[in-house]
């Protein structure tokens, strides 16, 4: 978040953290507490910094941030699918199904934003010549 210069990407990340990630964390904390599982220690939150405070050579650019978040969302989709497939408790499986849906929606939103900003470069089209057939 501290490295983001694009306002649309910053809004997306804030919404992703506030609406999706924090709600997932709270739901999982509640599930663990109900089942008597001790919560692991969490690191302290990082302070908010201005992008101007970060030296230009140390900044992560918006394209890299969007790609990393997209990769994280894709990994989250796979993880949620694995939990749903292996889960014996229906309530936990449904919970991860909800997480899966939120991650899929966030992925589509990020893809649209990335296309709009020109951050997604489509690969060259493969044209088959009649000589190659």
Regions found by a protein language model. Name each.
Residues 40-41, 95, 122-123:
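Short, hydrophobic secondary-structure boundary micro-motifs
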Residues 1-2, 51-102:
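Acidic/histidine-rich alpha-helical segments that form the ligand environment
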Residues 30-67, 71, 126-133:
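Carboxylate-rich helix-loop segments that flank metal/cofactor sites and access channels
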């Amino acid at each position: 978040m501290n490295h983001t210069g694009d306002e649309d990407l910053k809004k997306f990340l804030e919404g992703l953290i506030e609406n999706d990630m924090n709600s997932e964390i709270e739901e999982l904390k509640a599930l663990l507490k109900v089942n008597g599982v001790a919560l692991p220690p969490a690191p302290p939150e990082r302070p908010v910094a201005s992008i101007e405070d970060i030296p230009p050579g140390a900044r992560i650019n918006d394209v890299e941030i969007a790609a990393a978040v997209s990769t994280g969302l894709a990994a989250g989709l796979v993880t949620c699918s694995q939990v749903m497939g292996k889960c014996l408790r229906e309530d936990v499986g449904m919970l991860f199904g909800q997480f899966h849906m939120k991650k899929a929606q966030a992925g589509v939103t990020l893809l649209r934003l990335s296309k709009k900003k020109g951050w997604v470069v489509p690969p060259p089209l493969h044209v088959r010549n009649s000589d190659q057939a």
